[in-house]
Design a protein with these regions (language model features):
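Non-catalytic effector/regulatory segments
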Residues: 1, 35-36, 69
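Arg/Lys-rich, positively charged N-terminal/basic patches that mediate binding to nucleic acids
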Residues: 1-28
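Residues that recognize and position ribonucleotide moieties
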Residues: 2-3, 55-57
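ATP/adenylate-binding site constellation spanning eukaryotic-like Ser/Thr protein kinases
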Residues: 6, 51, 79-82
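Residue-level signal for pocket-adjacent positions within structured domains
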Residues: 11, 38-41, 80, 84
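Enriched for short, Lys/Arg-rich terminal
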Residues: 15, 21, 59-63, 67-90
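Conserved short hydrophobic interaction patches
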Residues: 27-31, 82
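A short, surface-exposed loop/turn module that caps and links secondary-structure elements
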Residues: 30-56
């Protein structure tokens, strides 16, 4: 699947530790190689009526948040530790 990133996502990714940046890179390679959301590991739709088309992927204690756009591309919005991730996303 194709994806684009927000400025906030790029900034948050730069602030990750080296180990978590490597894990994120592996996850992004997996995203590029998959064809459907159901093939992404640990991917779940966000709950709530205002969160339609918003998803998160769990990797360790970190979460990657994205929105599925109408053309089928993923818009990566945020990445960060589980604790405060859900306060910021979506």
């Amino acid at each position: 699947m194709n994806y684009t990133t927000s400025a906030h996502f790029r900034k948050a990714a730069r602030q990750l530790s080296d180990e978590n940046r490597k894990r994120l890179a592996i996850l992004l390679n997996t995203v590029e190689e998959t064809q459907t959301l159901s093939n992404l590991p640990n991917c779940k739709e966000m709950q709530g009526k205002n969160n339609k088309d918003y998803y998160r992927i769990r990797f360790g204690n970190y979460r990657l948040g994205f929105k599925l756009q109408t053309d089928g591309t993923l818009f990566l919005i945020d990445v960060g530790p589980r604790g405060d991730f859900y306060n910021r996303f979506p």
